[in-house]
């Protein structure tokens, strides 16, 4: 019986690979519901949505908004890891990244949600556990290209993008 099983492994590697993938793939994480009605929010704010996804990525590397109008940014985390969201002033990507790299040395980094205390930060989320979300309401922004990153240690180099305000 054992030899027959081993023979199947050798002769049908694709099937076995699929079986293994199914066995180790975690169940999908459902994101909590939004407490605030999105239709009501859209009457006063531009709605932008962003997800933290598998592979240390945001689902979008670029977002667009209209200058002079308030923004409601809905950040959700269906990933298995914790993530945050930090929005910086135009031309601040490298400074955000440098601050993200150095925050790990701060003994209060976890309490700070891994959000550095620098002037370039316009807005940030809390540290989002898997299956959670946060709505960040922004005052109207001027035209520009605003960088956003996840500042959880080691994430910012891959997990980044730009909000372009036109």
Where are these regions (language model features)?
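Extracellular/periplasmic metallocenter environments
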Residues: 22-38, 81, 110-112, 119-166
């Amino acid at each position: 019986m054992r030899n027959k099983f081993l023979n199947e492994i050798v002769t049908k590697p694709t099937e076995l690979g699929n079986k293994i993938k199914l066995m180790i793939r975690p169940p999908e994480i459902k994101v909590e519901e939004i407490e605030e009605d999105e239709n009501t929010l859209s009457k006063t704010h531009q709605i932008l949505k962003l997800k933290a996804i598998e592979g240390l990525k945001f689902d979008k590397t670029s977002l667009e908004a209209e200058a002079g109008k308030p923004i409601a940014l809905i950040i959700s985390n269906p990933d298995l890891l914790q993530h945050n969201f930090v929005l910086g002033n135009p031309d601040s990507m490298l400074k955000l990244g440098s601050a993200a790299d150095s925050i790990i040395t701060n003994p209060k980094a976890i309490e700070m949600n891994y959000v550095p205390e620098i002037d370039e930060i316009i807005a940030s989320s809390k540290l989002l556990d898997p299956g959670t979300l946060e709505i960040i309401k922004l005052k109207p922004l001027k035209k520009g290209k605003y960088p956003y990153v996840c500042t959880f240690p080691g994430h910012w180099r891959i997990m980044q993008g730009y909000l372009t305000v036109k």
